[in-house]
């Protein structure tokens, strides 16, 4: 679409066979998680903007590069908070958003001690992976060592979170949103479907629209997203939204990734 709109498009990542590259004017084999390499590439090519799409780990890189080059962006520190699950959970808790009880750790011995503060079942997640990789639902402490090792194997920062499982009321909420100059201007929320038997790598099976839930839930979600956008001083940005209405009646924002797709 960017090409159709007349933009000169340059793509980069470490997988040359990814399908999007064939539509770009130029492709460079540079990992989107290597901030300095992407910065040097963008500076050399004198780009006018950097956009992260479909993958949370690329979002901080885009913000970092734009900030260093003086290009339009939301603050790098804010994007980093949105992109790392432990930082995001801490931010939510400190700013009075609903958040499941959680602990952060970086090793099995630490997790074994910390999990005593939680009620099973719990979710174990890498703080910085994408595509639901390394996510497991733990129902028995005997599973802990394997699940910790799995989560750590997908974390570049070698950090994980363990959080109490939220019993959903209805479907999980998923979709995209856009802010313009810090104001939420658009969203499309859908019902997200998961296999009832899934216990690992919680990738959705699909989504459907229109969203089937009470209008007041949408209103509450809009208010929470706008508050996050305002407090984090986000600018003109796309977001990937994941939320859950718990059976306890509380609405939880699980993800507000600073990227679309």
Locate each region found by the language model.
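ATP-binding N-terminal substructure of ATP-dependent carboxylate-amine bond-forming enzymes
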Residues: 1-78, 109
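Short acidic active-site motifs
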Residues: 37, 110-114, 143
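A conserved helix-loop-beta module that forms one wall/lid of the active-site cleft
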Residues: 67-134
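ATP-dependent carboxylate/phosphate-activation module, predominantly the ATP-grasp catalytic core
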Residues: 167-172, 176-234, 238, 245, ...
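Conserved ATP-binding module of the ATP-grasp superfamily
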Residues: 98-100, 121-124, 136-169, 200-207, ...
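Structural motif
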Residues: 50-53, 102-105, 165
């Amino acid at each position: 679409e960017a090409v159709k709109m007349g933009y000169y498009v340059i793509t980069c990542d470490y997988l040359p066979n990814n399908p999007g590259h064939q539509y770009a004017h130029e492709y460079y084999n540079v990992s989107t998680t290597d901030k300095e390499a992407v910065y040097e590439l963008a500076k050399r090519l004198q780009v006018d903007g950097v956009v992260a799409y479909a993958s949370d780990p690329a979002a901080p890189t885009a913000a970092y590069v734009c900030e260093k080059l003086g290009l339009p962006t939301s603050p790098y520190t804010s994007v980093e908070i949105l992109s790392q699950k432990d930082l995001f959970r801490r931010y939510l808790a400190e700013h009075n958003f609903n958040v499941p009880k959680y602990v952060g750790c970086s090793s099995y011995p630490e997790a074994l001690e910390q999990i005593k503060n939680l009620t099973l079942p719990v979710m174990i997640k890498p703080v910085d992976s994408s595509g639901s990789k390394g996510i497991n639902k733990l129902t028995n402490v005997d599973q802990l060592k394997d699940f910790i090792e799995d989560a750590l194997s997908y974390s570049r920062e070698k950090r994980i979170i363990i959080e109490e499982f939220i019993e959903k009321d209805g479907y999980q909420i998923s979709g995209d949103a856009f802010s313009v100059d810090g104001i939420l201007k658009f969203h499309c929320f859908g019902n997200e479907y998961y296999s009832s038997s899934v216990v690992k790598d919680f990738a959705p099976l699909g989504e459907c629209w229109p969203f089937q839930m009470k209008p007041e839930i949408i209103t509450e979600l809009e208010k929470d997203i706008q508050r996050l956008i305002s407090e984090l001083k986000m600018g003109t940005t796309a977001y990937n939204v994941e939320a859950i209405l718990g059976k306890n009646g509380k609405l939880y924002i699980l993800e507000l990734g600073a990227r679309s797709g």
